[in-house]
Each structure stands twice: as structure tokens, then as C-alpha cells.
Amino acid sequence: MTMTHPTFPMDLDTYQPLALDPTCATLTDAQRATLKANIQLCRDAIVFFTATGAARGVSGHTGGPYDTVPEVMILDAFFRGAPEQFVPIFFDEAGHRVATQ
């Protein structure tokens, strides 16, 4: 019997680690483009997993997690850009559409 190894339908390797300086109030065009691409990738993954869960009868909804992706991506970039200033832990109140803390 031949074993097949299905591939994940999204290329998660396109995620681009981004380091932002939290003291800088503006983004460069390149930083903005990277941030937007990372947000879209994560949102697409959330929708994918919600849809495949729905197909199995075990899903909820994308609402809160989908809505908080921009905050999470910005926090991740701050964690990378100034690691000495942050404890790199995300608290999201279970994705119930509250601000990520």
C-alpha cells in the first residue's frame, strides 16, 4: 500500500516574522505590506479551520479570533522588535471579541 502525505492547502511558510519598534509611530511601506500579508494569512487559516470543523460538525464561528488577528500580529512584531520590554504571552479572553491583552 502506498502512503500519501497530503499537503496543507495553505503555504504557512509565507508568514514573515516582523520586528517593530514600539516607540516608532509610523510604519514603512514594507512593514505595512508585511503586516497586511501576515494578517491575511492568519485570517485565511482561521476561516479554513472553522470551515473544516463545520464539515465535521465540531466548529464554532470565526468572529472573535478573526477580529483580533491585527492586534495579535502587531503584538508579535513588538515582541520581536523589543523582546526586553515584553513578556511574550498573548491573553485573548478566549477570542470573545475583546482586545488582546
Predicted segments, located by residue:
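Thiamine diphosphate
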Residues: 2-101
